[in-house]
Design a protein with these regions (language model features):
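Hydrophobic (often cysteine-bearing) scaffold residues that line and stabilize catalytic clefts
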Residues: 17, 21, 25, 92, ...
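Short amphipathic alpha-helical segments and their helix-coil junctions
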Residues: 1-13, 166, 174-180, 243-251
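Mg2+/Mn2+-dependent nuclease catalytic core
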Residues: 123-242
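Short coil/turn segments at secondary-structure boundaries
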Residues: 6-9, 113-123, 257-262
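Charged, glycine-rich intrinsically disordered N-terminal tails and low-complexity linkers that flank
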Residues: 1-59, 296, 311-342
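A residue-level signal for conserved active-site and pocket-lining positions in enzyme catalytic cores
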Residues: 25-26, 155, 213, 267
Length: 342
């Protein structure tokens, strides 16, 4: 249901503080990689779109700390919706900086971009899979084409001999939120995100024949690396096909309480559609009139409950047509890997 409300209807809320702190940490690490790549190209300065000029050859810890402070100032002004008891505090800055240093110092800088041959920092990919199985057509939305993959990769390094390594930084939990299971070395091999990165990297960097995909859980376990070769591409495409068909053929999205009842508390604490109602929007909010529902009788339904109710009443096509956020268009995305359209 969360996928449907966010990416089909465009109903997205503000980020939580933990996620926003992760964004800040990512940005600090991104700048170190951008500086290293620029230094490899003989450039002394980069002009970052968020914090301005940064020298590429200054590796002093104090300088990186100052970069972190500039990043933190920029994003806390951007993420100014954390107020009251949840307002930004000195401890938050200390967390962001310590997380970045933790990633950089691991095993004497094994994953420090400044000690690597950087191929790309934050490269974007956006392409269609031009296969028959990837076709879609929705005449009611004037929408047709092929499944498109779009995203952003944190870091790509050249290890030599046709081997590239992708590093994806994670500041959150080492957990698959879809299944509730913890990631480990065994189940990461078929991780959809890493598989998608491999598929994209073969397009971006055809000169490489082998890719190491490292997902680095900074605070919950460290780096985990899986190895993909050209021979894995067929299985990767099959995983993408099954996921695409599952989404395409869904008439009634599943909800967390039905999938994992013990995790249903997350609906009202972590999910925007579960925490908010349609009050104050262009959609008329509904009162709960059915006994035994998650929303108490007589209270305003959450967005999730109302969407689910209307799907049962009118069907998913009707809800998609009438509940889509103003200005939102299915199939359009913003400039970043995790953004819905700007």
């Amino acid at each position: 249901m969360q996928f449907y409300t966010e990416y089909t209807l465009g109903l997205r809320g503000l980020g939580g503080k933990k996620a926003d702190k992760g964004t800040i940490t990512h940005k600090i690490l991104e700048i170190t990689a951008l500086c290293k790549k620029a230094a490899q190209e003989g450039k002394a300065v980069i002009d970052d779109e968020d914090i301005g000029e940064v020298f590429t050859d200054n590796y002093e810890p104090e300088y990186l700390n100052s970069i972190g402070a500039r990043v933190y100032e920029h994003y806390t002004q951007l993420f100014n919706y954390h107020t009251g008891k949840n307002a930004w505090r000195d401890r938050d800055f200390e967390d962001c900086l310590s997380w970045a240093w933790k990633a950089l110092k691991y095993k004497d800088g094994m994953y420090d971009p400044r000690q690597r041959d950087v191929v790309d920092a934050e490269p974007h990919f956006d392409f269609e899979i031009e296969e028959d199985w990837a076709k879609y057509e929705y005449p009611e939305y004037n929408l047709s084409g092929h499944l498109a993959l779009k995203g952003t990769i944190d870091l790509v390094s050249d290890l030599g001999d046709g081997v590239y390594e992708v590093v994806d930084w994670k500041t959150g939990m080492r957990k698959d939120w879809a299944s509730g299971k913890e990631y480990n070395q065994n189940n990461l091999f078929n991780n959809p995100q890493l598989r998608m990165y491999h598929y994209a990297c073969k397009r971006l960097y055809p000169e490489a024949h082998t890719f190491l995909m490292t997902i680095y859980f900074i605070n919950t376990g460290g780096p985990f690396t899986v190895h993909y070769q050209d021979s894995d591409m067929k299985q990767t495409e099959e995983i993408l096909r099954k996921r695409f068909e599952e989404i395409r053929d869904t008439d009634e999205p599943q909800i967390l309480p039905r999938i994992r009842p013990k995790d249903c508390w997350k609906c009202r604490t972590m999910c925007h559609a579960g925490k908010t109602t349609f009050e104050g929007t262009n959609i008329e909010p509904l009162k709960e009139h059915r006994p035994g529902q998650r929303t108490k009788y007589g209270e305003t339904m959450s967005k999730c409950e109302q969407v689910r109710y209307m799907i049962k009443l009118k069907g998913i096509d009707w809800v998609t047509k009438h509940y889509m956020a103003p200005g939102y268009t299915v199939g359009k995305y913003g400039s970043g890997g995790g953004k819905v359209q700007d």
